[in-house]
Amino acid sequence: MNLTEQLVELAEQIESSDPIDWGMLSINEHDAYMLIAGSVLDSYLGTEPDSRDMILLATVVKLTVENFVLNLKLMQK
């Protein structure tokens, strides 16, 4: 199993505790995970090792805030 597949497997396991509603999307769930995991891994490996942790943490913060805002918008509907 390559690193992208390992990332996808772990992410899919994490999703099982907080499932995403894929019903209204026209992309296969596993394909979406593979696409994004490959992109994230490419970005990670293309970053200087001494900068990786800070960039990774900043990215997690940005995505968490984005998810928070999207969830608030959905709850207002």
Task: List each language-model region with its residue ranges.
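Residue-level signal for secondary-structure boundary elements
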Residues: 15, 19-22, 48, 68, ...
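Long, hydrophobic or amphipathic alpha-helical segments
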Residues: 50-56, 60-63, 67-70, 74-77
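N-terminal acidic leader/helix
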Residues: 2-35
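Residue-level detector of solvent-exposed, low-hydrophobicity positions
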Residues: 10, 17, 29, 40, ...
